[in-house]
Regions:
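Alpha-helical transmembrane segments and their membrane-interface boundaries
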Residues: 1-207
Length: 207
């Protein structure tokens, strides 16, 4: 909630403020309900639900890659997925998310109501073009993140959400940036494993 509030007080969705505000409310509903439901299903069924949920978040909330709204919406979704709760705790989460949605929408509308946007929700749908680099990036996010999550869960990896977060952060709108980040991440991961292994054997077990 705090992340959304801090981001969307300045960032926008590139369309009419009223429609953007309604979309924000919808995003909160999706982030509140879908991660919890996906955790109740098998990894494969959960993957399908995650694909559907992320499709709405990314296609309508991440239309402008330069805003990096995926770092807010997709990250928030994955964190809620990874730290799922049940019972009384989930009821408290519902209350917290509802209050957070109301506050975020209020701040967003107040800060953007005087701005003029030429596009609306219909324009976002019409601009979906499978041949454009933006749409290809969106589809890659929509499909790859849930697939990586599913694979991690099928392999019984603890906190599979971190695999999804790693995939999300590596899938960038511009191909040259993505290639650069992936190369650097491979080198960094190898160096990290080596350092951890060395420290594991050098440091006393009492630490």
């Amino acid at each position: 909630v705090l992340l959304c509030l801090m981001v969307f007080r300045n960032a926008d969705l590139g369309i009419h403020t009223g429609q953007s505000t309604m979309l924000l409310a919808l995003f909160f509903v999706i982030m509140t309900v879908c991660p919890h439901l996906a955790n109740q299903f098998s990894p494969v069924l959960g993957m399908l639900l995650n694909i559907a949920a992320l499709a709405v978040l990314i296609l309508f909330g991440c239309h402008n890659p330069s805003m990096f709204n995926q770092s807010t919406l997709v990250l928030g979704y994955l964190l809620l997925y990874g730290y799922d709760v049940t019972g009384k705790s989930y009821q408290m989460r519902l209350v917290g998310m509802a209050l957070g949605a109301a506050l975020t929408c209020f701040v967003f509308y107040r800060n953007h109501k005087n701005r003029t946007y030429k596009r609306n929700l219909k324009d976002l749908i019409q601009e979906f073009d499978i041949t454009s680099s933006r749409t290809k990036w969106q589809i890659c996010q929509i499909l790859c993140v849930p697939i990586v999550l599913c694979i991690a869960e099928l392999c019984n990896m603890p906190r599979a959400m971190w695999a999804g977060i790693a995939a999300m952060s590596a899938i960038l709108p511009f191909m040259e940036d993505m290639h650069y980040r992936v190369r650097k991440r491979i080198v960094g991961n190898i160096a990290g494993v080596i350092c951890f292994t060395v420290l594991y054997f050098l440091l006393p077990s009492s630490i």
